[in-house]
Amino acid sequence: PLMPDYLQQIFIDSFSKDAMTGTLQRKTDRDWIDVLVRLRSELCRCPHCGKETFVRTDKAVRCIECRKIIKPQGRLEIGRMSLPVLAGVKLYKCHTSSEGNTEIENAQIFTGEIVPSKTTAGVLGIKNLTTGQWKEIKPDGTKKDGKSFRIEPGLKVEFGKPPIPGHITSTSNLPVGKIVPLD
């Protein structure tokens, strides 16, 4: 199947015989919005072929075009949402704003992106595309306001005002070691 299992499941739960006869509780608009925002958050470009595909934060997946395995370098967890750490992943207002997670329109407003370093292969960063400042909190507790941050295990980011906390959870292939600035 091309679509992620959680999208298939909400369709089954919503349109099954049990759901249609009322023996199963109906899925709410909020349930659908949560699934569609997750779907949008996991839509990425394959690092192998460049085509759009769905990337999970909890497991490696195959690109729906080239069939090569894609494993994100980690997860960016923001509230109840989890985004794959992969170049090109977009952050939306529904992720980074306190007013953002109740309206479906806010899943269309870009606020940031995971980008590759211009100078160091394999190093990724979070780029702030808003006019406001985001705060980086390094694993050693050092805090800094800025527009871009190098992704590393244990990195925390406060998005916007009031701050929405986010943090990086690493997977086994997240680059570690020497800290290289994101240019």
Language model features: what each stretch is:
Residues 1-30, 34-35:
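C-terminal lobe helix-coil module of Hanks-type protein kinase domains
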Residues 39-43, 56-62:
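Short metal-coordination and nucleic-acid-contact micro-motifs, chiefly zinc-binding Cys/His arrays
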Residues 66-75:
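Short Cys/His-rich micro-motifs in 6-15 aa windows
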Residues 126-130:
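Asparagine-centered strand-capping/turn motif at beta-strand->loop junctions
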Residues 135-183:
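C-terminal boundary/linker segments immediately following FHA domains
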